[in-house]
């Protein structure tokens, strides 16, 4: 097939052409926290459908996700329903996990994480099962869907907020990852959280009820 050589036009440069996934970013320039920012980010994801892969059934994708600033207001309310007291904003970290479907293996992995957290001088606050809608997934994605859970970890009083706390969380994460090979840590931070999965771009907002 003949290759079409494109000339420079405006800001376009052929040398910057790549066959990769799409990416987008949305921020509020005044730093105002709003669900509108999340909604706009999800629209960007949905507009990048042409950059995403699909399997033969047309209902299972090759992966899509979104990274968000942790909403203290949202998680304080969600955790209260679970009987988890998370304290003040950025005084806690959230780990997002893909656990195995097997109940015993999942219980073992959760217990191992709790032990590691305590060993690192952090306080484990509790688990929250992430509310999802499996019905929107394709057959293949639904068959291998992990158990998605969030862990809440309290910041020690003698540790500063922000990077210092996140470093401590990272150490706990890495130790857990090296000790367990059947659980995937999606994210772990006191500032950001990631929601993602092997589904189509339009399924991201409908699969995760948190969004």
Model region roles, listed by residue range:
Residues 1-211:
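N-terminal segments that mediate ammonia production and transfer
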């Amino acid at each position: 097939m003949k290759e079409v050589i494109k000339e420079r036009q405006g800001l376009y440069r052929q040398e910057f052409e790549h066959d990769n996934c799409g990416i987008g970013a949305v921020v509020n320039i005044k730093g105002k926290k709003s669900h509108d920012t999340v909604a706009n980010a999800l629209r960007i994801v949905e507009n990048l459908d042409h950059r995403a892969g699909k399997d033969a059934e047309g209902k299972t994708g090759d992966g899509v996700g979104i990274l968000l600033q942790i909403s203290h207001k949202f998680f304080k309310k969600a955790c209260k329903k679970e009987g988890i007291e998370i304290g003040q904003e950025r005084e806690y970290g959230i780990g997002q996990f893909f656990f195995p479907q097997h109940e015993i293996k999942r219980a073992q992995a959760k217990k191992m994480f709790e032990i590691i957290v305590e060993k690192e001088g952090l306080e484990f606050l509790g688990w929250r099962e992430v509310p999802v809608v499996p019905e929107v997934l394709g057959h293949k994605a639904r068959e291998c869907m992990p158990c998605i859970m969030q862990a809440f970890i309290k910041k020690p009083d003698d540790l500063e907020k922000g990077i210092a706390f996140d470093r401590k969380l990272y150490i706990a994460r890495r130790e857990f990852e090296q000790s367990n090979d059947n659980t995937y840590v999606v994210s772990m931070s006191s500032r950001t959280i990631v929601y993602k999965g092997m589904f189509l771009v339009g399924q991201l907002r409908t699969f995760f009820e948190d969004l």
